[in-house]
Every structure is written in structure tokens, then in C-alpha cells.
Amino acid sequence: MNNLFAQSRSHWVRYDRYEIKTGKDGKRYITPEKTAKPDIYNPLKDSPEMVLEALNVGMLMMNRRPEDVVEKAILSFVTHYGLLGLMTALPTTPSFMDYEAVYLPKNHFIKEESMATEDYLALFYPFDKLDVVKKGVESSWNVSGDNMMIALTMTFMDEPMAKNMSFQREYAEPYDWVAQQFKDWAFTLTTSILYYNDYDSIDEDTRNLYRKAMAAFGGIAPSYHIELLEKPTIYWDFHSLLLGIQMMFSFMLVDDAKPLRLCKHCQKVFLGSRANSAFCSARCKNQYNVYKSRGKNKGQDGEDNA
């Protein structure tokens, strides 16, 4: 996995501060704070750490942790890496501004197969609208007043308009959608781990359910090009952070050298040093053995007192 991305680059935008705001529709959204500053970074630089953090946010929900704990973890992830880019991840193309309408494959969040562009944009700009004019397949977008936003727009002029728009401070993503995506990734990981751990103890019908669940995991492969930097470098054209995480997670999921594992004690996702790694740390291993020993002793005491 490391070899695949060692000579690779990409880019995404994150802000230094995010907040959760409630819109007029009563829904909660994650959005940059009004004075937050953007930062352009390479998400492939620390890709294993990013995927692990995403999976562990999802595991908090799988393990039914309190909502305030989940909320804090989601905001922490977004501050580290930025929003997921759902606006460009969901349609059939990130260049949907070049078409008369937005076309959507089947997904968790939007039932419609197509939407008017203005209605679709409204899902991601619930507070302040961008100055966008849409007439048929023609689109224009005016950015003025905020020099930082103008500079950000100019930086990504060669990108699809919608991707560029999603880097603006006004952009927001529904909190429930973001949370669900993290949970979906954690579900995919646990499905894979349980399938192999329980293979001999489950029947064929259950195995088929696991296989179908895994078959549903996938995505559109991102495009790439080669840039001549200090040396030839693969540059991945991720039009959403979601797609980048999905691809990196996929490669990590099939990596035998450093397999993704769930800690037997704390349920934290970690990269194992070998296929049968069971604990994320020596501390967790020791605590697990202590609790296991105490459980045995209690059982023996009960038998002695019977």
C-alpha cells in the first residue's frame, strides 16, 4: 500500500475551524466557521492515518458510543482532513455544472435519480448562497469581496466548477450524511473481519450475506496523470475526499503485509504487524488478559461456593 502511494500526490482543502450549525430546515450541518482559514494539503501524505481515523470514527457509532463523543470525533476528523466532498461524490460526474440537471446513481442520501441543479446546490449551501447563474448547460459563478476565497478559486480554475465551489467557506455538508458515511466504512471493515474470523462457525447462507454486503462496497476509480516534479509522480485527481478515502481503504483492506485489524480489547481499528494481530497495543493485551483472568477466577469462586 505504501509503495502504491509513495510516489503519488493529490490535493484537498481543509479549514482550521469547523462548526455544527442548524439550518432553517432543522437539519444540522458541518461548515467552516466564518473566519476560518483554508489550507491546501496532500491527503496522500498520511493516507493510512486518515483512513484509520475515519474507520475509528465509524466504530464509535457501531459500538453505540454517546452522541457527544461521536460529534467530537467527527469534528476532529474534519478539522484534520476537511469535509468529504459529498456534493461532487454523489452525482454521476463531478462536472455536473456542465449539464442541464444533476444525475444521481443509487445512494443512501438522495432518493431522486435526477435533480434541478439549483435544488441540488441548495442541499450544500443552506446558509449563504454562492453567486451562481445557471442557464441550461451554461454556468457562471462570481466570487467577490473575500480575497482569500478569490485566491482559492483561482488556484483551482482548472478543476470542475463544483469541486472548486465546494472549497468555499459557504459550503456545508449535512451532519447525518457525514456520520452515516463513517459508519458505512466501519461496517465494511467489520463485515470483512467477521467473515474470516467466523467462517467455520457460520452457515453458507450467512457467508453469502457477508459476501453481498462486501460486494456493495466500491466506487468509481479516480483518474490520474503523471507530473514531472523532482521525479515522475502520479497525481490522483480526487474530486472528493470521500473517493480518495474509499480507494485508499480498499487497498488497505486487501493488504496482507499490514492488515487492518480490530483490537480484541478496545475495538480500535489498527494496522497489524501480522495477519493474526489481535491487539492495538501491549497495554490492551495486558488489560484483556487481566480481565479474562478475573473472569475465570470469579467463575471458579462461584463453583467453590455452590
Annotate each predicted stretch with a short phrase.
Residues M1-F270:
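Short helix-coil boundary/hinge micro-motifs
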